[in-house]
Amino acid sequence: RKREAFIREFIPIFQSFYSFISQDREKVGLSYDSHARDASLLEVLKESRARDQIMGYSLRGVHKDELNMLLGDFPIKREGSQGQNKTYLVALKLAQFDFLKRTGTTVPLLLLDDIFDKLDASRVEQIIKLVAGDSLGQIFITDTNREHLDRILHKVGSDYKMFRVEQGTVAEMKEEEA
């Protein structure tokens, strides 16, 4: 029941991030299917215990619950483009970040690792607008394309530091290097 309550609270946050990034071009959703929806979890486990013992593993329970990720009314994994799937993932992560920030006692860090791969320019620009604001706090962005990263940082216009990682060594880049 708590998982279902969480999903009900989480969906609008997630949808608002996806809607912003995609500029309202697509509708997305999440649904939670639980084995214990019509009966208590204890009843579900008791009912399947004999079969579970024969099989050697549990066939029902919370570990078998499904979180359905939808683009319109269809599974995004099967129907979405690579860019739509990436947008979905980014929106999920931003919604998780926002949820943790609002419900937790500390502000989490946000790591966007090679985030702009597979995204068109308009989606990248929308993500930049989101991360440029003060609402997200400290953010780490990685990208293997230096020119691409320079364009992104120029658009953000916020304070930032740039680091180079070579052979496991991290060094801050001086302004003239950046």
Where are these regions (language model features)?
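H-loop (His-switch) motif in ABC-type P-loop NTPases
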Residues: 142-144
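Conserved NTPase motor "head" modules and their coupling/switch loops across ABC/AAA+ ATPases, GTPases
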Residues: 1-109, 118, 122, 126-138, ...
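Walker B catalytic acidic pair
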Residues: 113-115
